[in-house]
């Protein structure tokens, strides 16, 4: 018989840097999960990734207080900022441009995000990432 699911907890945690402080501690503490066990498992799973990169994670908490978790790819905006070498997007993306990004970089990001995105093909995913880039005030170059 399958375990009974008590809750799903969605968080963004820095890769390799999970610790019991907020937001991890309070979110998991409410569900009665062993926080240190999650932190150790998460840090072990993300140690191959760049430290500090925010990683979305969905934690499934079961009625017996055990848990499983699934890590996703970093948000597109974070990958775009890293590729363009900027700290933050534009407050007025239609007027103020903050950086430039090439189509090759967009395609690379789309391939990284492919596992978590829904799209017919890599071109459709690239166009989706391109829209995110434009809304951040990045200029897309061919």
From Swiss-Prot:
| UniProtKB keywords | Methylation, Ribonucleoprotein, Ribosomal protein, RNA-binding, rRNA-binding
Modified how: One or more lysine residues are methylated.
Q: Does the keyword ATP-binding apply?
A: no
GO terms for molecular function, please?
large ribosomal subunit rRNA binding; structural constituent of ribosome
InterPro entries (UniProt xref) = Ribosomal_uL11, Ribosomal_uL11_bac-typ, Ribosomal_uL11_C, Ribosomal_uL11_C_sf, Ribosomal_uL11_CS, Ribosomal_uL11_N, Ribosomal_uL11_N_sf
Read off the CDD domains from this record. Answer: Ribosomal_L11
Please, one GO biological process term? translation
Domain of life from the UniProt record: Bacteria
Identify the Pfam families for this entry.
Ribosomal_L11, Ribosomal_L11_N
Record GO cellular component, one term: cytosolic large ribosomal subunit
Q: What does this protein do?
A: Forms part of the ribosomal stalk which helps the ribosome interact with GTP-bound translation factors.
What do we know about how this protein assembles, alone or with others? Part of the ribosomal stalk of the 50S ribosomal subunit. Interacts with L10 and the large rRNA to form the base of the stalk. L10 forms an elongated spine to which L12 dimers bind in a sequential fashion forming a multimeric L10(L12)X complex.
| HAMAP family, A to Z | Ribosomal_uL11 (MF_00736)
Q: Name the NCBIfam families on file.
A: L11_bact
Q: Belongs to which family? A: Belongs to the universal ribosomal protein uL11 family.
Protein name as catalogued: Large ribosomal subunit protein uL11
Q: Which gene encodes it?
A: rplK
């Amino acid at each position: 018989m399958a375990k009974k699911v008590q809750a799903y907890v969605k968080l963004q945690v820095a890769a390799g840097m999970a610790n019991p402080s907020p937001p991890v501690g309070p979110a998991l503490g409410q569900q009665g999960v062993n926080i240190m066990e999650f932190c150790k498992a998460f840090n072990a799973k993300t140690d191959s990734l760049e430290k500090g990169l925010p990683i979305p994670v969905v934690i499934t908490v079961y009625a017996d207080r055990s848990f499983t978790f699934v890590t996703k790819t970093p948000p597109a905006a974070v990958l775009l900022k890293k590729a363009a070498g900027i700290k933050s997007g534009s407050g007025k993306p239609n007027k103020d441009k903050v950086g430039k990004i090439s189509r090759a970089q967009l395609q690379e990001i789309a391939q990284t995000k492919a596992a978590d995105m829904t799209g017919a093909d890599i071109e459709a995913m690239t166009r989706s990432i391109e829209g995110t880039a434009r809304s951040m005030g990045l200029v897309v170059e061919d």
